[in-house]
Curated annotation (Swiss-Prot):
It comes from the Bacteria. Residues 4-181 form the Guanylate kinase-like domain. Keywords: ATP-binding, Cytoplasm, Kinase, Nucleotide-binding, Transferase. It is found in: Cytoplasm. Essential for recycling GMP and indirectly, cGMP. The keyword Kinase applies. This is Guanylate kinase. Belongs to the guanylate kinase family. The gene is gmk. The lineage of its organism: Bacteria, Pseudomonadati, Pseudomonadota, Alphaproteobacteria, Rickettsiales.
Length: 206
């Protein structure tokens, strides 16, 4: 059994990473989305333990001090972090894990473990602003702040293994699914399985 692959999807806020991730885990039972810890309040219909683990700042800091975070970041005065234990235990079972995090979190993870990273670029800043506005969860000032942060985030695209322009969401979903499928078939991920299969072929007689 191969070890699972850790996939990272990043994008500016409103860039589509969460929507794409939800599609992937709905299509493929052999991949699970990592649920991040956060100190922010739930938005809309978000549920604890499904969308995020909503914790207090004291609880978050305790987890951080105990080494439970594979990566962490602060965004708009809210803290976010990925569980190190969940990632390792899930990968050990041969199940792939998908993390939706920003470029800073991706940078931290790259320094600690192997991963495949995908960055989603918005087709334009105007379309990104429209997406942020349509969510109806942020004030005008927060949206302007997110757009400024987006300009910083997209400059880090070259650190990623794959970069896609998310102009057509349906097309982007299929492209990311294809990337995951291709990565699973690489020999480095399946060397032992292929080696055993080839050995069995060599033992056969014609």
């Amino acid at each position: 059994m191969r070890k699972g692959i850790l996939f990272i999807i990043s994008s500016p806020s409103g860039g589509g990473k969460t929507t794409v991730a939800d599609f992937l885990v709905g299509q493929d039972l052999s991949i699970k989305r990592s649920i991040s810890f956060t100190t922010r309040q739930p938005r809309g219909e978000e549920k604890d333990g499904i969308d995020y683990y909503f914790v207090s700042k004291d609880e978050f800091n305790r987890l951080l001090q105990e080494g439970e975070m594979l990566e962490h970041a602060t965004v708009l005065q809210n803290q976010y972090g990925t569980s190190h234990r969940y990632i390792e235990e899930t990968l050990a079972l041969g199940i792939d894990v998908l993390c939706c995090i920003d470029w800073q979190g991706a940078e931290q993870i790259r320094k600690k473990t192997n991963c495949i990273s995908i960055f989603l670029l918005p087709p334009s800043l105007q379309k990104l602003k429209t997406r942020l506005t349509s969510r109806g969860t942020d004030t005008a000032d927060v949206i302007e702040y997110r757009l400024k942060v987006a300009l910083e985030e997209i400059q880090h695209f070259s650190k990623y293994d794959y970069v896609l322009v998310n102009d057509d969401l349906t097309e982007t979903k299929q492209k990311v699914l294809s990337i995951i499928t291709a990565e699973r078939e690489k020999l480095v991920q399946n060397h032992r399985v292929v080696e055993c299969f080839v050995a069995s072929l060599l033992e056969q007689t014609i």
